[in-house]
C-alpha cells in the first residue's frame, strides 16, 4: 500500500538541511504521520536513512516547556532509553528523530514486554539524574484549568466535584513527604516502541520532570 505523499512546512527544509547536512533535493518520500494531541509530524528520507520531523501545534507554547523537553530527551538518549532523538530547537519547538522502520507499540498484554518497559522506568527513576523542570500532575492540572477559565466557565458535568477530590488527594500526597525522582509522565504503550531488533525506545518526553 502506498503512503499518502505530502510536503513539509516551508521552514522544515532549512531546519533539516542544517542538522542533517543534506540539500533540499535529497529530502524525499514525505508523508504525514498520525497526528498527536499537541504536534504535527512527517516522515521523510535522505540518503542516510529515514527520519521524522515534528512541528509543534498552535498554542502548544502554553502547554509544553520545550527547553525542559530537550533536556529530558538528551538525558534519555544518554542513558539508552530513547535511541530515536537527534535534535530539538528549543526556541521554535521543532524536532528531528530517527524513524523506526517496522516498529511496533508495546503490547500491554505481553508480560515480557511489560517487564522490559518496567525495567526502563526503573532505570530512569534510579538514574540519579536531575532536570531543571519539576512536573507535578496536580499543579499542571490547575495550570490547564486556569488557561481554560480564561476562555470562559468550565461547564463539564461533575467537574467541580472531581476537582475537589483532586484537591484532597494532592493534599495527602504532599503531606506524605515522599522523595521525588525524575519521571517520564506520559508512560503508556503508544510511547514505547519496539524496533526490528527488539530494542525498546521510550519516546515523547514533553512532560518529563
Question: Which residue stretches match the model-derived regions?
Answer:
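Active-site acidic catalytic loop and adjacent metal/ATP-binding pocket
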Residues: 31-46, 52-53, 168-209
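Juxta-kinase regulatory segment immediately upstream of eukaryotic protein kinase catalytic domains
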Residues: 1-29
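ATP-binding pocket architecture of kinase catalytic cores
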Residues: 31-139, 144-161, 175-179
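Short Pro/Gly-enriched beta-strand edge/turn motifs at strand-loop
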Residues: 21-28, 68-69, 165-176
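A broad structural signal for short, well-ordered beta-strand segments within beta-sheet-rich domains
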Residues: 24-27, 78, 199
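A generic alpha-helix signature
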Residues: 6-11, 67, 161-164
Amino acid at each position: 500500500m502506498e503512503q499518502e505523499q505530502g510536503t513539509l512546512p516551508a521552514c522544515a527544509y532549512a531546519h533539516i538541511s542544517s542538522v542533517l547536512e543534506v540539500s533540499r533535493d535529497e529530502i524525499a518520500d514525505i508523508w504525514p504521520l498520525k497526528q498527536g494531541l499537541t504536534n504535527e509530524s512527517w516522515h521523510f528520507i535522505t540518503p542516510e536513512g529515514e527520519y521524522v520531523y515534528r512541528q509543534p501545534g498552535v498554542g502548544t507554547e502554553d502547554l509544553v516547556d520545550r527547553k525542559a523537553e530537550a533536556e529530558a530527551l538528551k538525558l534519555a538518549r544518554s542513558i539508552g532509553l530513547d535511541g530515536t532523538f537527534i535534535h530539538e530547537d528549543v526556541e521554535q519547538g521543532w524536532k528531528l528523530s530517527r524513524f523506526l522502520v517496522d516498529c511496533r507499540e508495546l503490547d500491554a498484554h505481553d508480560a515480557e514486554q511489560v517487564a522490559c518497559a518496567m525495567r526502563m522506568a526503573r532505570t530512569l527513576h534510579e538514574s540519579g539524574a536531575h532536570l531543571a523542570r519539576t512536573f507535578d500532575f496536580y499543579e499542571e492540572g490547575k495550570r490547564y484549568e486556569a488557561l481554560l477559565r480564561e476562555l470562559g466557565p468550565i461547564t463539564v458535568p461533575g467537574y467541580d466535584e472531581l476537582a475537589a477530590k483532586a484537591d484532597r488527594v494532592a493534599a495527602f500526597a504532599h503531606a506524605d513527604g515522599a522523595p521525588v525522582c525524575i519521571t517520564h509522565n506520559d508512560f503508556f504503550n503508544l510511547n514505547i516502541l519496539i524496533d526490528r531488533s527488539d530494542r525498546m525506545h521510550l519516546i515523547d518526553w514533553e512532560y518529563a520532570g
